[in-house]
Amino acid sequence: MVISVPATSANLGPGFDTLGLALKLHNTFSITPSKLSSIHISGEGEDRPKLRIDNVFIKIFNEILALHNYPMQPFKFSFHNAIPISRGLGSSSAVIVGAIVGAYHIMQKPINKSEILQLALSYENHPDNITPALYGGFNVSMLDSSLKTKEQVINVQALLPTDIKAVVVIPNVAISTKFSRRSLPKKYSTKDAVFNLSHACMLSAAFITHKWELLRVASQDRFHQELRMKNIPALFNVQKIALENGALLSTLSGSGSSFLNICYCDDSGNLAHILQKHFPKFRVIELEFDNIGATLIES
């Protein structure tokens, strides 16, 4: 059995902990019943012994099986990681979603994405990456605690069309979300809060109605982006050059260090070429959007 989960880009500027989308860059997780337990990792992180010794996927997978009183047994795990680790592209969300979906398939339990989403929230308490990893497309997510004893995720998904594409710039610097959040203030002014609220609403409307001309102005942010970009000052130039060369939107991806640029498909090759020329030490990749999310690709 093989599960595929896409990379994700969250925040998208003003949508802090709320907005996210899925990209066609996937981690695959193979799970096979076996006489002996084993783990093999290829791709990103394959040279990190910690990923084998203390593997988060296996930990969550086993916890979900135990939650449903499923008898424990040995498995052969084989993971291929295409999503860069600690680069703001949802590698941790892919692991969480993949582990839960994988456990459901092993138990032959019907895939209830709403139920899986709530389980995933117990491992990552902000849903902006979790929802697109699970559902695909563009997602608006919120946490609601008004009627429940614990917070519930509510999300709305919109499919992304094929006339736009992502050009992602990936610096050779890892930044953890926990570290990145330390640079953020505890309080914001009413003026900045209204600014972000209005821009996040307009950005959501632009994605849902496909009014791409609004992306540039609607993706401005006053909560987190510039503060986080100061950790890697070159990102200010990435954004400037991208917007001067066809990008409709240019924002920090999640907490960084990657930068998400969205452009028309006809402009993606030129934009990628220019960015790679200016930033030869960074990876620059063109990606389509993923509208499927986590899926079983081999039973």
Swiss-Prot record:
Keywords: Amino-acid biosynthesis, ATP-binding, Cytoplasm, Kinase, Nucleotide-binding, Threonine biosynthesis, Transferase. It catalyses: L-homoserine + ATP = O-phospho-L-homoserine + ADP + H(+). SUPFAM superfamilies: GHMP Kinase, C-terminal domain (SSF55060), Ribosomal protein S5 domain 2-like (SSF54211). GO terms for biological process: threonine biosynthetic process. One of its GO terms (molecular function) is ATP binding. One of its GO terms (cellular component) is cytoplasm. InterPro entries: GHMP_kinase_C_dom, GHMP_kinase_C_sf, GHMP_kinase_N_dom, GHMP_knse_ATP-bd_CS, Homoserine_kinase, Ribosomal_Su5_D2-typ_SF, Ribsml_uS5_D2-typ_fold_subgr. Pathway: Amino-acid biosynthesis; L-threonine biosynthesis; L-threonine from L-aspartate: step 4/5. It is found in: Cytoplasm. HAMAP family: Homoser_kinase. Belongs to the GHMP kinase family. Homoserine kinase subfamily. This is Homoserine kinase. The gene is thrB.
